[in-house]
Amino acid sequence: MVRLGVNIDHIATLRQARGVDYPDPVEAAMMAIEAGADGITLHLREDRRHIQDDDVRNLKRKLTVPMNLEMATAEDIIQFAEEIKPEHCCLVPEKREELTTEGGLDVAGQQNTLKKVCARLAKVGIEVSLFIDPEEKQIDAAKAAGAPVIEIHTGHYANAKTDHEHNQQLKRIADAAAYADSLGLTVNAGHGLTIHNVQSIAAIPVINELNIGHSIISRGVLIGLAEAVKEMKTLIAGAQ
């Protein structure tokens, strides 16, 4: 069964929009877990635009499922992760001006740096994944960097405008997933996945986990967060 990691960043986005103390990401995480989330994902950005340090601390104390902390390779955030010790860390690229993560890490271009970060996090018991585009050279570089897990960026698939482009991007992801699996890597995926496009990705045989946030939180505004999580879980299960 493909696992569902629910990203709660945009609960914090809603809170930060008013500079108040609600809605509480911890409360949202507990609701998501009750509804069937297999893990909770959150991105501690360098600019702290949504998730704050205390959110991570509070969640780590209360979570009953694994935490997946998305993070850049900034030294202060690496040190914070070493202190908090989430079960998983996903290293992602980051630009201050972006609305959301726009693509995968160039692991091949910064392999030495990433190898050191992977080793540091692994030393304190954190399983590290690298968020990458579905390209063999990036998968090879991730393997060489010592990451046991990759997360395939599904954004180009999600943003495809035509059936041809959709099918082309889906094949890229499926081929990349199979290649990574052949190297012994665990394969996760995420970015831009919704109730309308998740099943084709969930049906890829070697996918271990999907990390989904914005679309679940958005659906939650309309139908309730618990129902939105259950809906996504049902769709993922139906794709197996």
UniProtKB/Swiss-Prot annotation:
EC identifiers of the protein: 2.6.99.2
Residues at the site labelled Transition state stabilizer: 151
Residues at which 3-amino-2-oxopropyl phosphate binds: 7, 18, 192, 213-214
GO cellular component terms, A-Z: cytosol
Pfam families per UniProt: PdxJ
Keyword list, A-Z: Cytoplasm, Pyridoxine biosynthesis, Transferase
GO BP annotation list: pyridoxine biosynthetic process
GO molecular function: pyridoxine 5'-phosphate synthase activity
Residue sites binding 1-deoxy-D-xylulose 5-phosphate per the record: 9-10, 45, 50, 100
Active site: 43, 70, 191
Family indicated by similarity: Belongs to the PNP synthase family.
Protein name as annotated: Pyridoxine 5'-phosphate synthase
Organism of this sequence: Coxiella burnetii (strain RSA 493 / Nine Mile phase I)
UniProt gene name: pdxJ
